[in-house]
Design a protein with these regions (language model features):
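Amphipathic alpha-helical segments at domain termini/boundaries
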Residues: 9, 23, 27, 70-89, ...
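NAD(P)-dependent Rossmann-like dehydrogenase/reductase catalytic/cofactor-binding core
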Residues: 1-3, 28, 176-180, 209-210, ...
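Rossmann-like NAD(P)-binding element
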Residues: 41-44, 58-117, 124-126
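A general alpha-helix detector
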Residues: 52, 152-153, 200-204, 249-254
């Protein structure tokens, strides 16, 4: 499947990521069918999309007419057969459950043409182990980041049987939608960013649990150093600007010892146990004062 053959895109799953991903494809000019088995989930997705587009208009990022056109290009449906009718590209973003994803992949494989490209937003699961053998040449991982309508990165990983044409089409399509796809030559659990994030999580929870700083001070430190520098140099090029000899010396002579990784950090799970789940409940590490998710996003 080549880029010019793609006109209709199905986005399967309207949870946390689906609405923003659907918006991104629609902003690229494609007709999008957003599917979820749950009508309430679709109603919520519709509200999120309208709020997102209204924000773009209010911030002068889009004229009203263009925002209306983007919204009109998205169809909401709770019927999988309708979502897959005549599509050339399928973006899966259903629950992170192997049984659910495997079932969806099997249904998709049976309902779309052999040439249709299917990509997965799986984060903690290996999607290449769940997709039918018959689809593997036209299958890739396309891992987005929240909020997907804003953050440009999409990590695109190939499987052992992913065709060269499929990879090129996925990468080109994402660029056409204004995204920044980063190509991984093979799948690795966590892709790039989540692997780095796991290491950061270890330090974040260590610092919070030991009372070394507050969440606000930790975030301030990162925003005032790592993030602005990272926008320019990333993580690897920074070593070149520091000097590889200096970096090597710092590693050899440093007194820092990384804390042990915990799969149940108290700094996180204490909030979870109290039902403080972040913006979805109005409180997490920060207190959002009763503001809704739509107001905050």
């Amino acid at each position: 499947m080549k880029l010019g053959e793609i006109q209709r895109i199905a986005v399967l799953g309207s949870g946390t990521m689906g609405p923003g991903i659907a918006q991104s494809y629609a902003m690229g000019g494609y007709e999008v069918l957003l599917y979820d088995i749950s009508k309430p989930a679709l109603d919520k997705a519709r509200g999120m999309l309208l709020a997102n587009l209204d924000t773009y208009v209010q911030e002068d990022l889009l004229p009203v007419e263009e925002a209306d056109g983007i919204y009109r290009r998205i169809t909401f449906t709770n019927k999988l057969s309708k979502a897959l009718d005549g599509v050339q590209f399928v973006q899966e973003t259903v629950a992170e459950n192997p049984g659910v994803k495997r079932s969806v992949f099997e249904q998709v494989d049976a309902m779309v043409s052999p040439e249709t490209i299917v990509v997965s937003n799986a984060s903690s699961l290996n999607p290449f182990e769940l997709v039918p053998e018959s689809r593997k040449a036209n299958f890739a991982a396309a891992h987005w980041f929240a909020p997907p309508q804003i953050l440009p990165l999409v990590e695109v990983a190939k499987g052992e049987k992913t065709s060269k044409e499929t990879m090129e089409t996925v990468l080109t399509l994402l660029r056409a939608c204004g995204k920044t796809p980063v190509r991984l030559e093979k799948y690795v659990p966590g892709y790039i960013i989540n692997r780095i994030q796991i290491l950061l999580n270890t330090e974040v929870f260590y610092l919070l649990e030991n009372g070394i700083c507050t969440p606000e001070q930790l975030d301030l430190a990162v925003k005032a150093s790592l993030m602005p520098r990272g926008m320019v140099l990333g993580l690897v090029q920074r070593y070149d600007f520091t000097g590889l000899d200096i970096s090597a010396n710092n590693i050899m002579n440093g007194s820092y010892v990384m804390p042990e990784t915990s799969r149940h950090p108290a700094a996180l799970f204490d909030h979870v146990d109290k039902g403080e789940l972040g913006i979805k409940t109005g409180k997490g590490f920060y207190d959002y004062g009763g503001r809704s998710r739509e107001e905050l996003c």
